Regions:
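A short, charge-rich alpha-helical start-of-domain segment used by transcription regulators
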Residues: 2-8
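Divalent metal-dependent catalytic cores for phosphoryl transfer on phosphate-bearing substrates
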Residues: 25-137
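Charged phosphate-binding loop/patch that engages nucleotide di/tri-phosphates or the phosphate backbone
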Residues: 146-162
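A hydrophobic, small-residue-rich beta->alpha segment in the mid-to-C-terminal subdomain
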Residues: 138-145
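Short alpha-helical patches at coil-to-helix transitions and adjacent helical residues
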Residues: 9-13, 64
């Protein structure tokens, strides 16, 4: 799981930093983006996801808030927010309730520009095909399975970041 986590996180960090460097007008905190991108999936080891060598007891959808808890204990509250808010295009309180997700009842959508950038960059990489950057079309197809709101958010990020 460690090698998968680090490889995936490096891909996300590199994509996010490349976007940040291409958009100096956004004044993105690149040091924070690098750190938070490297830590955004720290909670995966607590989940039951054998395909990525994780044998914990929680459903995979919980990895964001579980990672957030780890980083809060380490006194990294801003990094913790990235963990909690990066899944998909973020998860709203309404989605948590409607889909009966096993998550704390609070909004988990990215707010800061840095949170949004890491969430966006994360969409381009899976943990099962580490070397492959996903196409925009593939990402749209994956997001459509969850909600049309996710696709709309993704398109807004494409306009902002690409």
């Amino acid at each position: 799981a460690y090698d998968i986590l680090v490889n995936h996180s490096e891909s996300v960090a590199n994509k996010a930093l490349s976007i940040a460097h291409n958009h100096p007008e956004l004044k993105i905190d690149t040091e924070f983006v690098f750190q938070a991108a490297m830590l955004h999936d720290i909670g995966i080891h607590l989940t039951n996801a054998p395909s990525i060598a994780c044998y914990g007891s929680y459903p995979y959808v919980c990895h964001g808030y579980l990672g957030s808890g780890i980083l809060m204990e380490e006194q990294l509250p801003q990094h913790a927010l990235v963990c909690e808010r990066h899944t998909g295009t973020g998860i709203s309180l309404e989605e948590i309730v409607t889909r009966k997700l096993p998550l704390p009842l609070r909004d988990m959508k990215p707010i800061s520009l840095e949170e949004q950038l890491i969430c966006f960059a994360d969409l381009f990489f899976s943990k099962t095909h580490l070397e492959e950057e996903l196409s925009i079309t593939t990402i749209e197809t994956k997001l459509q399975k969850f909600s049309s709101h996710s696709v709309v958010q993704f398109h807004q990020w494409c306009d902002l970041f690409l």
